[in-house]
Amino acid sequence: MKSILGLILVFTFNISLYGSDCEAPISKDRFDSLLKTVEFKNNDHQKYILISAYTNRECITVNQLLSFIDLIDEHKVKVSIVQESYNSVFDKENTDLLMTNFTEHEKSIILKSVK
């Protein structure tokens, strides 16, 4: 349990260090490779860790983030991924598209956490 908490803290700290100054999103080939890696993971927690690590290092588009989210079953984990990855989104003008599958309450939670 302590190691999981430690990983979450490390990833949270890394958000402020990486991905906040996106100049361009990753290429389609690179993204497809990352997506396949995530697809092979067995559970949402493992997928969350990988997606968080990738988005801390790479700039992604809203559509790419949505592709990652589609691999997750648990809705709360989807919210967490958006919160964790939002700073790495290149095309923030498409945020509305990203928020379409969330309730108003979840949208407000996400937006509060990324400001």
Language-model features: where?
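Sec-dependent N-terminal signal peptides
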Residues: 4-15
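General marker for long, soluble alpha-helical cores
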Residues: 18-115
